[in-house]
Amino acid sequence: MYDVITVGSATLDVFARTKFSELIKIIDPKGETDLLAYPSGSKILIEELDFTTGGGGTNTAVALSRLGHKTAFIGKLGKGTNSDFIHKELVKEKVALL
Protein backbone atom coordinates (compact mmCIF):
# COMPACT_ATOMS: atom_id res chain seq x y z
CA MET A 1 0.00 0.00 0.00
CA TYR A 2 1.26 3.47 -0.92
CA ASP A 3 0.58 6.79 0.76
CA VAL A 4 0.67 8.58 -2.60
CA ILE A 5 0.64 7.44 -6.22
CA THR A 6 1.53 10.09 -8.79
CA VAL A 7 0.60 9.98 -12.47
CA GLY A 8 2.40 12.17 -14.96
CA SER A 9 5.50 12.86 -16.95
CA ALA A 10 9.07 11.69 -16.47
CA THR A 11 11.75 13.75 -18.18
CA LEU A 12 15.48 14.22 -18.10
CA ASP A 13 16.50 17.78 -17.22
CA VAL A 14 19.94 19.01 -18.31
CA PHE A 15 21.48 22.10 -16.70
CA ALA A 16 24.52 23.72 -18.33
CA ARG A 17 26.71 25.81 -16.04
CA THR A 18 28.79 28.61 -17.51
CA LYS A 19 30.31 31.92 -16.46
CA PHE A 20 29.70 33.49 -19.88
CA SER A 21 26.33 35.12 -19.33
CA GLU A 22 24.99 38.40 -18.07
CA LEU A 23 21.77 39.67 -16.54
CA ILE A 24 19.78 42.20 -18.54
CA LYS A 25 16.81 44.14 -17.23
CA ILE A 26 13.63 44.14 -19.33
CA ILE A 27 10.95 46.74 -18.61
CA ASP A 28 7.48 46.42 -20.12
CA PRO A 29 3.96 47.58 -19.15
CA LYS A 30 3.60 44.63 -16.75
CA GLY A 31 6.74 45.54 -14.81
CA GLU A 32 10.39 44.67 -14.96
CA THR A 33 12.31 41.43 -14.86
CA ASP A 34 15.89 40.22 -15.16
CA LEU A 35 16.78 37.81 -17.94
CA LEU A 36 19.88 35.68 -18.36
CA ALA A 37 21.49 36.61 -21.70
CA TYR A 38 24.15 35.10 -23.94
CA PRO A 39 25.76 36.66 -27.03
CA SER A 40 23.77 35.73 -30.13
CA GLY A 41 25.49 33.28 -32.45
CA SER A 42 28.49 32.75 -30.21
CA LYS A 43 29.96 29.60 -28.74
CA ILE A 44 29.85 29.37 -24.98
CA LEU A 45 32.18 27.33 -22.80
CA ILE A 46 30.14 24.99 -20.64
CA GLU A 47 31.94 24.19 -17.42
CA GLU A 48 29.61 21.55 -16.06
CA LEU A 49 26.49 19.61 -17.08
CA ASP A 50 24.04 18.39 -14.45
CA PHE A 51 21.51 15.69 -15.29
CA THR A 52 18.44 15.28 -13.08
CA THR A 53 15.03 13.74 -13.36
CA GLY A 54 12.18 16.09 -14.07
CA GLY A 55 8.51 16.07 -14.89
CA GLY A 56 5.50 16.69 -12.71
CA GLY A 57 4.82 13.08 -11.81
CA THR A 58 8.36 12.13 -10.85
CA ASN A 59 9.18 15.42 -9.10
CA THR A 60 6.10 15.12 -6.89
CA ALA A 61 6.78 11.47 -6.06
CA VAL A 62 10.41 12.20 -5.14
CA ALA A 63 9.51 15.23 -3.01
CA LEU A 64 6.90 13.28 -1.05
CA SER A 65 9.24 10.31 -0.67
CA ARG A 66 11.86 12.62 0.82
CA LEU A 67 9.23 13.79 3.30
CA GLY A 68 8.79 10.20 4.47
CA HIS A 69 5.77 9.08 2.44
CA LYS A 70 5.66 5.73 0.64
CA THR A 71 5.27 6.78 -2.99
CA ALA A 72 4.83 5.24 -6.42
CA PHE A 73 4.86 6.67 -9.93
CA ILE A 74 2.72 5.76 -12.93
CA GLY A 75 3.99 7.06 -16.25
CA LYS A 76 5.61 6.12 -19.52
CA LEU A 77 9.35 5.49 -19.67
CA GLY A 78 10.92 4.72 -23.01
CA LYS A 79 13.91 2.52 -23.70
CA GLY A 80 17.44 3.77 -23.71
CA THR A 81 20.04 5.58 -21.67
CA ASN A 82 17.81 8.45 -20.53
CA SER A 83 15.07 6.11 -19.33
CA ASP A 84 17.63 3.95 -17.52
CA PHE A 85 18.93 7.06 -15.73
CA ILE A 86 15.42 8.12 -14.68
CA HIS A 87 14.60 4.60 -13.47
CA LYS A 88 17.79 4.39 -11.37
CA GLU A 89 17.16 7.82 -9.84
CA LEU A 90 13.60 6.89 -8.86
CA VAL A 91 14.78 3.64 -7.27
CA LYS A 92 17.48 5.58 -5.39
CA GLU A 93 14.80 8.01 -4.15
CA LYS A 94 12.62 5.07 -2.98
CA VAL A 95 9.87 5.70 -5.52
CA ALA A 96 8.21 2.55 -6.85
CA LEU A 97 7.35 2.33 -10.56
CA LEU A 98 3.92 0.87 -11.27
Features from the language model and the residues they span:
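A glycine-rich helix N-cap at a beta->alpha junction
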Residues: E89-L98
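Alpha-helical transmembrane segments within multi-pass membrane transporters and channels
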Residues: K76-G78
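Glycine-rich phosphate/adenosyl-contacting loop at the front of the ribokinase-like
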Residues: M1-I74, S83-F85, K92
